[in-house]
């Protein structure tokens, strides 16, 4: 609301790509940071390059994707990024970081942990010409009537598998249902930054405690298969569904708090309804976090980068 002591640089002048096909089954493409992301995904699909098709419909530019390791519907850019060219502000030099140096994690990277250290200039992706699409996310698989696998494999006859274009179109359709596309000005739910909170990644012990709390509150069945939604995460940890936690901590889809509120289609999206302020949005976000923390003992962290403000830690 009051601004912040800094400058925002837009990478709109950084455009273009360089294709290197000399990597066996892969094609490596270095894409300038200012290329629009969704258009680039569409280009890859049109060329038959697999690896990014599930990331369709995400707004922004290519240079933003490695910063928080953008992911959706079973894919993350870390799976295909091989290098990132950056301006190292501390050294005053342009350098190239390989994927290991980027230290990618769930919605995380060295760029996010050190936001003042680097300016992303270009990203190199390794894609699979003629490759099959990745269908490992259950919601996407159901929409495609495909059988998901943890590695995205599809055992059906190749002629029966969905194409890259079908996967991209289905992802966009799913995103539209959740108001996660920006092309409908009449949809007030689209005025958000996408998912405001990341899904908390916790130890199995914490996950068990969350489930015990939910059972004690009568939110899930005392026995049986009905449990708090959770998914395997690296290092033996567990990823909990933040949207479920929010909705079971007293916040409903479509709930309004003055000029801001929760999307009526997606509990993780906090929306601006017109005439609001950053302060009002963050007040709502902090109230949601506190309610989840008190009820389930788990803290939620914001997915967007916050400028000129702070966020409470667990």
Label the model's feature ranges:
Residues 1-91, 95:
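Anion-binding (especially nucleotide phosphate/pyrophosphate-binding) glycine-rich loop
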